[in-house]
Amino acid sequence: MQRYFIELTKQQIEEAPTFSITGEEVHHIVNVMRMNEGDQIICCSQDGFEAKCELQSVSKDKVSCLVIEWTNENRELPIKVYIASGLPKGDKLEWIIQKGTELGAHAFIPFQAARSVVKLDDKKAKKKRERWTKIAKEAAEQSYRNEVPRVMDVHSFQQLLQRMQDFDKCVVAYEESSKQGEISAFSAIVSSLPKGSSLLIVFGPEGGLTEAEVERLTEQDGVTCGLGPRILRTETAPLYALSAISYQTELLRGDQ
């Protein structure tokens, strides 16, 4: 069944007998899927609830829906994982956002690292963020997520440091930790986090984080960790981390 994310909370949807879908979703429902009155879709509210809905009326700029039933499906990771990626070259961040969304990331924080080759001014950063947000939304629909991960504004390194106290735990993926055999810290941290906790994981761009950046991150209570015995690419490391978290918190621990 086709899935759509709508900009209403569950409470707002329940306040009236029917609710309306507008914007780009209408084009997809009407012109791409060619749906009509009586067809059913899945709607996901802004606050992560999903409902089976029936189309009551269809026009070129608005679709009215009736909730048939709310479901209890929860496809979000038990912990909220924030992926902070030092801006990589090319379209690598698009790949990280698309696949990271499929693997359950809660949000993405692109930041300007010392070794980032890419330099974005405000205009380019805004345009990029719009594209990244669209990629996250499409990936969330495809993977049947309850929520669309938020793609935040491009941060400076200083802005990233200032945000670190917002999270329950912060991990710094550092290749020197892998080289030194420190591969158990990441698993221990994930195991210690209760359901609903927030975890920030910081990844460097190509070439990794500098020693100075790592030092400043650890001064803000970031914990350096290796991600296995092998050195991973900047676009591979976040996906490895998310897969490991999914295994440990969903398959192994069985949290729902």
From Swiss-Prot:
CDD domains named in the record: RsmE-like (cd18084)
Q: Which reaction does it catalyse?
A: uridine(1498) in 16S rRNA + S-adenosyl-L-methionine = N(3)-methyluridine(1498) in 16S rRNA + S-adenosyl-L-homocysteine + H(+)
Keyword annotations: Cytoplasm, Methyltransferase, rRNA processing, S-adenosyl-L-methionine, Transferase
* Any one GO cellular component localisation term in the record: cytoplasm
Quote the subcellular location field of this record. Answer: Cytoplasm
Asked if the record carries the keyword Methyltransferase, the reply is yes
Name of this protein? Ribosomal RNA small subunit methyltransferase E
From the UniProt record, report the name of the gene that encodes this protein.
rsmE
